[in-house]
Amino acid sequence: FADSTGLLYAHGTTYYGLKQRGNLQQGETLLVLGAGGHVGLSAVEIGKLMGARVIAAASTEEKLDLCRERGADETINYAEENLKDRAKELTGGAGVDVVYDVVGGDYAEQALRAIGWAGRFLVIGFTAGIPSIPLNLTLLKSCQIVGVFYGAMTARDPELANEIAEDLLQWVDSGELRPHISATYGLEGAAQALRSLMDRKSIGKIVIEP
């Protein structure tokens, strides 16, 4: 139960974003913001399965340790390092090919400034607030800002949604993909689980079992 909970939503969002919306190619560099959360961590895992070089960015070393365990090639602690400068340094100044942004806020512009020529910036969420971005950056870098709304896609294109589910389940069956569960609560612990999410203390996924 715990392993399957949320798989299709979080990992479905990621796979749809990276494959269909971001056109991530083998050998490209993927920068994941909010990489310590459930959705961000799924991007680290699936990015590696798709053959990308993955740079995981998160706010604590504990979260980054987990990202490294899950396959991240490089990490950035954006609570202590300048996100743009470090990402550019890790790519030899070229910038990243794809940004997977769960965070938004002030980090979104930093990540966009770290993107390379003809890069793709995937808008996934706004845990740090809805960002304001200078659109001239898209012209200067000839890059794309692309929204990823997996829930709406499943209703509009159920055939594609089924294909995504089949690919994900094949990875699960082969043992290549297994969602990380940071904590499991009973119904009586639901309030504590929600507090952990709101305080951004959780790493990976929290499951509430009936």
Please state what every model-predicted region is.
Residues 1-81:
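Mid-domain Rossmann-like dinucleotide-binding core that forms the NAD(H)/NADP(H) cofactor-binding site
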Residues 24, 91, 103, 115-116:
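A generic alpha-to-beta junction signature in SAM-dependent methyltransferases
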Residues 26-28, 96, 118:
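Phosphate-coordination loops involved in phosphoryl transfer and adenosine-cofactor binding
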Residues 34-35, 103, 126:
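NAD(P)H cofactor-binding loop motif with strongest signal on the N-terminal glycine-rich segment
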Residues 50, 61, 106-177, 202, ...:
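Glycine-rich phosphate-binding loop and adjacent beta-alpha segment
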Residues 99-100, 122:
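N-terminal Rossmann-like NAD(P) cofactor-binding module of classical short-chain dehydrogenase/reductase
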Residues 197-204:
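Glycine/proline-rich active-site loop of Rossmann-fold NAD(P)-dependent oxidoreductases
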